[in-house]
Amino acid sequence: MKAYFIILTALFSSCVSNHYDRTESFTFSWKIGDFDQASQEIEKLAESGPKRDRMLYRMEEGAIKRLQNDFEGSIRAFSLAGDYYEKWFGVHLQSQTKISEELGSTIGSQEWKPYKSRVYERVMLRVYQALNYLQLGKEGQARAEIFKIRQAVSDAKDIWQKELDAARIMMREKSMDLDNGLENQMEGSLYEDLLQARSLVPSNLPDFVNPAAIYLEALFFLHGTNEKSDLEKARFSLRELYGIYPANPFIQEDYQQAIKNRSSKIPTTYIFFETGRAPVRREKRYDIPLVFFSATSRIPYAGIAFPHLVTNHNYLSSLEVFNGSEKSLTLPLADFDAIVANEFTKNFPIELTKAILGSVSKGALQYIATNAVRDESEEVRAVTGVGVGALAQGLTQSDWRSWTTLPKQIQFCKIPSPASRELTLRGVGTKLRESIILKPATINLIWIRSISAQTPLRVVNQFVLKP
């Protein structure tokens, strides 16, 4: 009995430290703009932190090194993150672990499982990696990363369908009806939080789509090469963007160029502006009502821990660009509140299945443990009851993990490049300013990062798309 209790205690103790605790120092350093300290913190986690989280740490590391203008270091970190993706999903989604097995592993906390990333994260990994290569003048490698953006979205649709099918099967095996629970009389705080997430998503945003990734792809094919097939790719991407932003004058102009099979010869600069911080996940406890269970189920309800999205509101609202004679204001392109919420609601049935199955499994564990000592003394039964209860509570945790250094929004504008080649950037409503000397070229691209309305503007990328 003593050994049994020690095992329970050890298991419970292992639940205490979570991802939020481990990354708190790193996140704080990044938020205040101390990128050197943040880089040291995340490198340490990437090398010696839990192996299950290494992919996430490498993505964070790659993002921080970009802010330090360490593009070679960023490439290495993102390449290692990409290796984890290949490990989890393999070529053409031939993963080593079946999705049904992954869903069926429900005893431990969701945070104990390897972090395999979310779709919007995999897309941004490829976007940042393409920008890294373009900064270093490696157009061939950048082209390969841009193709991987489309592949990530295509893979995501297949993965999502397989996971949803597996979730339905697993729930049926436990005498629970997933679709009935979601479609009929779902109510309470969990439903309210789901509706709140849905309210962040505009009706014209397609599933798993990041407009900033599409636009970078379009500009690369419109201005970066002279091949006819590339102009066709640019036209395809800009048509998709035009469907999302039909009133955006910059997209309209580029789309017309693609339709005419020629890019502008007027010296122009594109400015991309990352601002704020992406939504984070935080845990809430919910009771799941009877509606999720079939008439043959003997379980009246299940208590679960489930994530809800928390948006960040401290951000620079827009960037003004001045070329000496005219001004241009950045306009919305990719809203990560919407992108993250869209994927969150899309995956809601799958994540809910994991949470419910985990709760049921832990309930069974409690029953087995207490039943095993029913003939023992009252003291032993009490200690066992407390121990397994604490263990179940510790194991009932949602997955808080996500790529936290992503922005709240990516905005953009374009402006004629002046003869002086000097641009002045100003944070709207602030005293934040930055001056940039452009390279002599037909098409320049600038990538700016702002973490909050108080932190300085950071020039991350500056390169030539068309000489």
Q: What label would you give each PLM region?
A:
Residues V91-I107, M171-A197, F272, P279, ...:
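Glycine- and small hydrophobic-rich membrane-insertion segments that are intrinsically disordered
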Residues I32, Q68, L136, G224-K228:
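Structural motif corresponding to the intra-repeat A-B loop/turn of tetratricopeptide repeats
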Residues S29, K65, Y133, F221-L222:
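Residue at a conserved register position within TPR or TPR-like alpha-solenoid repeats
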Residues A213-G324, S328, P332-D335:
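Membrane-inserting hydrophobic helices used for pore formation or membrane fusion
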Residues Y367-P467:
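C-terminal soluble interaction/assembly domains
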Residues C15-D34:
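Bacterial Sec signal peptide processing site at the extreme N-terminus
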